[in-house]
Amino acid sequence: PPYMLSPLPLSLGFSSQCESMDIRIEGEMTDADIAGRMRDVMPEGLRLLSVREPVMQPSEIAFADYRAQLCFDAPELAAGFLPGAGAALAGESLIVQKPGKSGRKKVMKEIDLLPLIASCSMEQKERAVLLKLILPAGNQTNISPALLLDALEEKAGVQDVGREITRLELLTKDLQMFE
């Protein structure tokens, strides 16, 4: 039977430039036919970029590349975020509570984010701080950028910060683009 599966659904409130979808259809159709039919029924704001045979298995997704923007009320507040967040990233550990499962029960698990972060850089742009993040994303380990941002904001002593988070790419364990 036909199906549609998103191997790594996007969190609510995030935007993306790279969602991947696995579909199965009945009958013979070309990639162009599939693309045309899907474009006709795509929700507003979603754009189909391409349809092609998969090169990799969804299980090969290991990381995601994100850009996050934290929006402050004043440049001084943005500048004040950097030392605390930088110290947290340079520390020995960054322990957070992450929702998880134990069997069928939902539990809170304590994890150290620092060894899981593949890449993190920060830069101030006037009233904003731009972060470039590569975080685990996949079947084995999945770290939401919101979880990391929550921890950095707490360590920097800021709250009620506006956020924009965009997923740019899904990546393999070798940090190659998932295809």
Each language-model region and where it sits:
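Short, conserved, surface-exposed binding loops centered on an aromatic residue
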Residues: M56-E60, S121-Q124
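Core RNA-modification/binding signature centered on pseudouridine synthases
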Residues: G91-E179
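Acidic, low-complexity central loop/insert segments
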Residues: R47-P54
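Short gly/pro-enriched beta-turn/loop segments at secondary-structure junctions
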Residues: E60-F63, A128
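Short glycine-/aliphatic-rich beta-strand segments at the starts of folded cytosolic domains
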Residues: E19-I23, A62-F72
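Helix N-cap motif at beta-to-alpha junctions
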Residues: E26-D31, D73-E76, G138
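Short, charge-patterned binding micro-sites
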Residues: P1-E26, P54-P58
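Short amphipathic alpha-helices in soluble, non-transmembrane regions
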Residues: D31-M42, L77-A90, L147-L149
